[in-house]
Regions:
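Short, low-complexity N-terminal intrinsically disordered segments enriched in polar/charged residues
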Residues: 17-50, 54
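Low-complexity, intrinsically disordered terminal/linker segments enriched in charged
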Residues: 148-167
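Short, cysteine-centered beta-strand-loop-beta hairpins and adjacent loop/turn segments enriched
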Residues: 69, 123-132
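A solvent-exposed, acidic/Ser-Thr-rich amphipathic alpha-helical stretch
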Residues: 50-114
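Short, solvent-exposed coil/turn segments at beta-strand boundaries
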Residues: 52-57, 139-147
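Sec-dependent N-terminal signal peptides
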Residues: 4-15
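Short, surface-exposed coil-to-beta transition loops
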Residues: 117, 130-137
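A short hydrophobic beta-strand element
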Residues: 112-122
Length: 167
């Protein structure tokens, strides 16, 4: 009886660990597909449509942390998608390249929660000039879609470099 009980407990623990990992893997694949679609959008100059809205929940929020906003700035889904399209309209190209992905944890329980953390390197290009920068994101999911992204990057440095290139 003890042996059966211990086997059941061990199997339950193993199943719950795999279940968390499965959520992470599924969400990670979803996020990687989004990055691929964003990169493709910028690579092909004739591609005008950006069909990435379905990657996000309707109440998606992008949180950024520029200088002067220690609690961050919230950007809703519509404005976030418009800002990506606006970059292309300004002849700015973006490529998200080098990335390191890690599973995220719940901020209260410290247990794996299916979220994705990513350290990335990106390049913004205008004509033949490039601006390279790094950033960090935490990405939360709800029912397989991106609910929120928190991003930390050197926005001031990127902005200064863009101003120099656009003179």
């Amino acid at each position: 009886m003890k042996k059966i009980l211990l086997t059941f407990i061990f199997a339950s623990i193993l199943f719950s660990c795999n279940n968390d990992n499965y959520g992470y893997e599924k969400n990670l694949d979803h996020f990687k597909s989004l990055i691929k679609d964003i990169n493709t959008y910028f690579i092909y100059s004739k591609q005008d449509s950006l069909a990435i809205s379905n990657y996000y929940t309707e109440d998606f929020i992008f949180y950024s942390f520029p200088v002067g906003h220690k609690k961050g700035v919230e950007t809703n889904k519509s404005d976030y998608l418009k800002s990506i399209k606006q970059m292309k309209q300004m002849n700015i190209s973006m490529n998200i390249g080098h990335s390191i992905y890690l599973p995220g944890i719940d901020k209260d329980s410290y247990k794996l929660d299916g979220s994705v953390r990513v350290y990335y390197g990106a390049t913004l290009s205008i004509d033949t000039s490039n601006i390279e920068f790094s950033g960090y994101q935490t990405v939360d999911f709800s029912d397989g879609k991106i609910l929120a992204i928190w991003e930390w990057a050197d926005y001031g440095g990127v902005s200064n470099q863009l101003k120099k290139l656009m003179k």
